[in-house]
Swiss-Prot record:
Reactions accelerated catalytically: sn-glycerol 3-phosphate + NAD(+) = dihydroxyacetone phosphate + NADH + H(+); sn-glycerol 3-phosphate + NADP(+) = dihydroxyacetone phosphate + NADPH + H(+)
Family classification: Belongs to the NAD-dependent glycerol-3-phosphate dehydrogenase family.
Location (main, coarse): cytoplasm
Recorded superkingdom: Bacteria
Protein name listed in UniProt: Glycerol-3-phosphate dehydrogenase [NAD(P)+]
Catalytic center residues: 195
Length: 339
């Protein structure tokens, strides 16, 4: 296939990367999709669909598959990175030698840098330099629904006004995909990481059998933790009432399409961490995000008791029910304290 020119190159051929590539192509754009496994890309090309993740969604004719990274990146100045957060920096290093001089980078990855807990924008600047335009898209999106063309809305934030406008034009589809611009580059990044953690907690609560009251309380107090951390990092608190905050949080905490939620349910039912991960069979971003978010909160002096108890379950073998009782037994306080 001719990949000499495209509106967007998508890096990452998992469920979400494929869904975004399909959406862009369905919008009338020529899109190049690249993945790290050439055999997987060749299979996608042969099948013209992603049988592993989105078996019922055929690829539009304008979605092109590419096994050669240099050719994929030469095709477009705009590059959408959709990879797990723990390999984000490594993937950018892999892309760097092949990027066009006019390249612009946007990512749909939700999370923080592994171990350090840094925002992904800080990682991108370190790898690619300060001058390259950067952007992030985040919000309540399950890949299957997006790929099926069901109505979806997300938030978009960028360091560059023109890039933001161009991306909004590329992604927005009046029939099914609404893209809201947001000037809060920090907040839009952070919401997607913290919601993964809280979704594990919501799953634990349901796995234990605590019911709807407990789940809703946990979501609400989880939003408070997200807002406290965001404010400490310089984000606009109102961002967390939007798509990248409350929207993504509610979706991930309440629907079993969420791997983080299903993982938490299994833990609440008594399964071990490794056993639950094995049963999910795909990356559970919230597992690593919990450690990273807690480290970030502690460095900035932010209290996040729900996140701390989830960490205790994941990394210190604490029983999920005991963690819940620890939260319920905390000292009484004002609801708006710290927000």
């Amino acid at each position: 296939m001719n990949t000499t020119h495209a509106s967007m190159t998508v890096i990452g051929a998992g469920s979400y990367g494929t869904a975004l590539a399909i959406t862009l192509a369905r919008n009338g754009h020529q899109v190049v999709l690249w993945g790290h496994d050439p055999k997987h890309i060749q299979t996608l090309q042969q099948d013209r669909c992603n049988q592993a993740f989105l078996p019922d969604v055929p690829f539009p004719d304008t979605l092109l598959l590419e096994t050669d990274l240099a050719r994929a990146l030469a095709a477009s100045r705009d590059v959408l990175v959709v990879v797990p957060s723990h390999v984000f920096g490594a993937v950018l290093n892999q892309l760097k030698p092949h990027l066009r001089p006019d390249a612009r980078i946007v990512w749909a990855t939700k999370g923080l840098e592994a171990e350090t807990g840094r925002l992904l924008a800080d990682v991108a600047r370190e790898v690619l330099g300060e001058s390259i335009p950067l952007a992030v898209v985040s919000g309540p999106t399950f890949a299957k629904e997006l790929a099926a063309g069901l109505p979806t809305a997300i938030a978009l934030a960028s360091t560059d006004v023109q890039f933001s406008e161009d991306l909004q034009q590329l992604l927005h589809c009046g029939k099914s995909f609404r893209v809201y611009s947001n000037p809060d580059f920090i907040g839009v990044q952070l919401g997607g990481a913290v919601k993964n953690v809280i979704a594990i907690g919501a799953g634990m609560s349901d796995g234990i059998g605590f019911g709807a009251n407990a789940r809703t309380a946990l979501i609400t107090r989880g939003l408070a933790e997200m807002t406290r951390l965001g404010s400490a990092l310089g984000a606009d608190p109102s961002t967390f009432m939007g798509m990248a905050g409350l929207g993504d949080l509610v979706l991930t905490c309440t629907d079993n399409q969420s791997r983080n939620r299903r993982f938490g349910i299994m833990l609440g039912q008594g399964l071990g961490v490794q056993e639950a991960q094995d049963k999910i069979g795909q990356v559970v971003e919230g597992y690593r995000n919990t450690k990273e978010v807690l480290a970030l909160a502690q460095r900035n002096g932010v209290e996040m008791p729900i996140t701390e108890q989830i960490y205790q379950v994941l990394y210190s073998h604490k029983n999920a029910r005991e963690a819940a009782l620890t939260l319920l037994g905390r000292t009484k306080k004002d609801e708006k304290s710290g927000i």
